[in-house]
Amino acid sequence: MGFPKVERLLINYKTLDEFKKFKGCGAQELSMLEELQANIIENDSESPFYGIYYGGSLIARMSLYMKRNGGEPFEITGPYLELYKLEVLPTFQKQGFGQMLVNHAKQMQFPIKTIARIHSAGFWDKLNFTPVSVTDGDFYIWHPETNLNAVTNEESA
């Protein structure tokens, strides 16, 4: 078995079955089942889902959306990525799989916006994200131009 790597997940019923393993492992807000089902119905060929397979099973996943214009009340101008619903199955947590997913997004060299969920502030801080507070909630931002050395060869997926 080779070293696990991040890959874009196919939008199909096999992926839907894999997502069911995550149900009940985290908060309802992390559920991607409905989102995946909607993409299957719409036959959306550009999957926003990325994951890591280990031993033939999906063990970690995230949604990644390209946004065309920052325009919101934060320090992003132009295109950026929104990273949603990063989740690693409990058995595989604290082994670097979440970091692998984030580093995959960082390699695209766009600013990244994410919302810290369920006691994850330390995780985002460790990965050089900056906390931002606005009236409608808190989130974290990573800027590639100020973090050129943040993804090293050892960290990259």
UniProtKB/Swiss-Prot annotation:
CDD domains: NAT_SF. Its EC number is 2.3.1.-. InterPro entries: Acyl_CoA_acyltransferase, GNAT_dom, YlbP. GO terms for molecular function: acyltransferase activity, transferring groups other than amino-acyl groups. The keyword Transferase applies. Pfam families: Acetyltransf_1. It comes from the Bacteria. Keywords: Acyltransferase, Transferase. This is Uncharacterized N-acetyltransferase BCB4264_A4022.
